[in-house]
Amino acid sequence: MECEPALDKALALTGGVIQTTDEYELLERTGLNSSCSSVMKVAAKSCKYEKFNEKGLFLSEHRRCYNEIIEYCNMLVYKGNLQPLRGDGKEDKKLAIRQWPQMGFKQIDADYSGRKGSSRLNRVEAEKIAEWLKNSFEFIVNAYPKEEIKNLVGIITPFKAQVKCIEAELRRNIPSLWNKISVGTVHTFQGAERKIIILSTVYGSKDGCFFIDANKSLMNVAVSRAKDYFFVFGDLNCLKDTKSSASGLLKKCVNGNQI
């Protein structure tokens, strides 16, 4: 059970934890309030180590993703403090698929997404993803002859209804391979990695993209799952134009790189 911020503030005042509502901000910064507490934040504040004027240990070296991919995460959440060490994909002589950009997109026009209960889905988007993989999967497998097939492609989407929709289309289009392609929400891929990650945005151009912009950490995880290529499948017009937002920065990074 989660305590709402308004109740959390009231309890802190009546319990004498804070004397004024202005002091509540201090609890939020230190991670001590019950509505949005963070054990990690409290631990970091107690740590004797400090880097980039932040308390706690910060692992600044990054080797998983090509630099073009991790640059998005670096700008989004790390304030430019990450040190990309893998190098640029376009400069790598061992790059598997040279004609593809490290960050790219496939435009799929849609005004609105569909609703299923409290979730969302976009059937056309799911169909296009399955169709693209049907046409490209053998090519991808041949480009990575020493890699296990299950480690090649992952598909991330913000909505569980879209997960089911994509899985159904994969079963229909590539029945012999669909179960070797991971499909799930960001949480499914926590700690995982794939050579290629596809993001199914789901939103239509008139929907906005609330879920994508709601939590920068989720987009950080989604993008950084991709070792070699990160592709956005959806209507790019649903993404914002402001670079300070997660979707706006993503739009900037993939713009002009249509696959």
Label every PLM stretch briefly.
Residues 1-259:
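Conserved helicase motor core of SF1/SF2 NTP-dependent helicases
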